[in-house]
């Protein structure tokens, strides 16, 4: 006979009645000494933690990464140390601008945040389903996100704000072109590629550094939603992508992605006219071809959405020995911002939660703080240096090689590199006629309510990318090209 599980309070006290509040008589007022009622309501009031400022609506799954190629030439990281080696992973997909209850089928980049639970700690590659981003200096990130959120007065989203910002930030053109193409609304999360987007680094056992860009190629192929179908699903099944991912894994249809990288030497980076750390631009795959590294599959759904998907706290600052960052400005800003956002959203000790805790364990001198539940370092000293032989000690063998720098500290104008148009134009010219028509139609539909001043300014950018691109948008909006040129 199965033993009965007794309902208790949070303090473990058995609950005799979970159907009726305690009252003064059958029709009298409730009593404050009904601690079960008070505790239940108080906890309910605090069930919701602050949602992410961006990437609030998300879906996730666990899986396994397997190395398929020898990586010793590039990295000393242990997760790469042998072919066929496997490492647990956690991948969180998301939309970017929408709130936690928004539709999965909005036109928006998709977050592609991948965690490797390695034997040397957690390694997080917090990317998107696009290889570039809208801006390249984190100083403008709050401004950009404000344009994607709701207006202060009306609490409505504003195409005027979006296009006003984009038209005054022409480095956004490449990402805008991707966003309004057929790939702007993926058919769920399984049928899209992922990217690290930024430039990262790998460091080998000899201390040699290579710059890399990460690419995740969907084994399921690419599928996108037509805008009309996306709109229909937003009303009939707003959790469409979440449902598709969860149910596919439950059926045993495990999605897979091939992990590839582009590699650039430090010498090549130093001699390039175009900044290789500019996240608004891609590297040529002809010059820097994709190199396969491995493959991962997602094969297990979370047991509890809040505990795992909502409380997971990914951060680009999580890197392991043999893996590093780069001078990419946006990456540098995110290294601080993401971990700081997690401390605000989840709490000071967010790394101790099961979904965030490294499998390798941790040893440091961090103590106390709200919701500390790991023993708090016990009786060990909470300072360093100290005389205790068993206390954690620094390990100089993990030091990264020096990074050569040049120039004085200053606020350098990143717009001295003003080629915002060639890669967006190249992308437009790669599209077939149907894809070009869809791109232009999507932009025209999105800009219809925008002021003529902003329309003219943005069309000028499209024209510089490709004359047919600008002319198509101008015709759709009824703008005389003579006003633009």
Language model region names:
Residues 1-485:
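Active-site-adjacent core segments of small-molecule enzymes
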């Amino acid at each position: 006979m199965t033993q009965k599980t007794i309902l208790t309070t949070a303090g473990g006290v058995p609950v005799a009645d979970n159907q009726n509040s305690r009252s003064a008589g059958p029709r009298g007022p409730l009593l404050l000494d009904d601690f079960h009622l008070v505790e239940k309501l108080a906890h309910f009031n605090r069930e919701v933690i602050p949602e992410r400022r961006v990437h609030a609506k998300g879906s996730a799954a666990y899986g396994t990464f397997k190395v398929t190629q020898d990586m010793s030439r590039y990295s000393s990281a242990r997760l790469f140390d042998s072919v066929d080696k496997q490492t647990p992973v956690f991948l969180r997909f998301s939309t970017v601008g929408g709130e936690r209850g928004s539709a999965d089928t909005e036109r928006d980049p998709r977050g592609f945040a991948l965690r490797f639970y390695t034997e040397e700690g957690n390694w997080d590659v917090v990317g998107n389903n696009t290889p570039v981003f809208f801006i390249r200096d984190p100083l403008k990130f709050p401004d950009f996100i404000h344009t994607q959120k709701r207006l202060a007065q009306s609490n409505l989203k504003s195409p005027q704000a979006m296009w006003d910002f984009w038209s005054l930030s022409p480095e956004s053109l490449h990402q805008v072109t991707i966003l309004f193409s057929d790939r702007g609304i993926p058919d769920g999360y399984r049928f899209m590629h992922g990217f690290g987007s930024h430039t990262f680094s790998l460091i080998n056992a000899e201390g040699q550094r290579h710059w890399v860009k990460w690419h995740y190629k969907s084994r399921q192929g690419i599928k996108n939603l037509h805008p009309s179908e996306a709109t229909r699903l937003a009303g009939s099944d707003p959790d469409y992508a979440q449902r598709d991912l969860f149910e596919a894994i439950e059926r045993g249809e495990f999605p897979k992605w091939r992990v590839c990288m582009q590699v650039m030497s430090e010498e090549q980076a130093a001699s390039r006219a175009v900044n290789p750390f500019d996240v608004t631009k891609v590297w040529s795959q002809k010059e820097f071809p994709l190199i396969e590294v491995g493959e991962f599959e997602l094969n297990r759904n979370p047991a509890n959405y809040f505990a795992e998907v909502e409380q997971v706290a990914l951060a680009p600052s999580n890197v392991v020995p043999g893996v590093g960052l780069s001078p990419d400005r946006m990456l540098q800003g995110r290294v601080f911002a993401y971990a700081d956002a997690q401390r605000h959203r989840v709490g000071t000790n967010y790394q101790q939660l099961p979904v965030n805790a490294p499998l390798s364990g941790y040893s440091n001198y961090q103590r106390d703080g709200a919701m500390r539940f790991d023993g708090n370092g016990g009786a060990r000293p909470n300072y360093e240096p100290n005389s205790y032989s068993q206390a954690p000690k620094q390990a100089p063998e993990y030091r990264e090689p020096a990074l050569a720098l040049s120039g004085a500290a200053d606020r350098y104008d990143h717009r001295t590199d003003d080629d915002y148009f060639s890669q967006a134009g190249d992308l437009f010219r790669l599209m077939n006629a149907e894809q070009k028509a869809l791109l232009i139609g999507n932009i025209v539909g999105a800009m219809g309510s925008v002021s003529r001043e902003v329309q003219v300014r943005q069309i000028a950018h499209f024209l510089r990318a490709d004359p047919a691109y600008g002319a198509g948008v101008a015709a759709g909006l009824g703008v005389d090209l003579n006003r633009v040129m």
